[in-house]
Amino acid sequence: MNTIGMDPSGLILDGLTQAIPEAAIGWDMPASSTMPRVRLALDRAAYQTPVSQYMRLRASVYAPQGDGRTCDWPKALALSETICRWLLDNRRKRPLIDASVESGPLQTHDDDLRQDFAYTVILLTVEAA
C-alpha cells in the first residue's frame, strides 16, 4: 500500500491565523519584532491504520518581553492553550480525523535565537490519500 497522510498544513495555518490574530504564525519563523510569533512544524509519523497516519504538530510560541530575550510566560502559555483548543475543536475537520495534546506547553530556551519560548506537541491523526 502506497498511501501517505493528506497534508493538513493549509487548514492548520489558516485556522490558527484566524484564531490568533495578535500573533505572527508560520511554518518558518515569522518575521516580527512587535508581536508574538508562532513557528509551526509538522512531522509525519507511523500509520495508525491502512487509511490514516499520525503526524506531530510542534508549536513554538515566542512572546518576548521588552528586553527581547525573556518570555512573557502568561502570554506564551495563553497562546499555546489557544492553539491546543483550536486543534481539539477542529479535530474532525478533514483531512484531520483526531487530535490530542502529546506534551506541553513546556517552558524552554532557543539557544540560536537566545530567547525563551513555550513548546507544545499535538498528535494528529490524518486521512491517508
Predicted regions located by residue number:
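A short, hydrophobic beta-strand-centered structural micro-motif
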Residues: S33-D43
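Charged, amphipathic alpha-helical segments and their flanking helix caps
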Residues: M1-A23, L42-A129
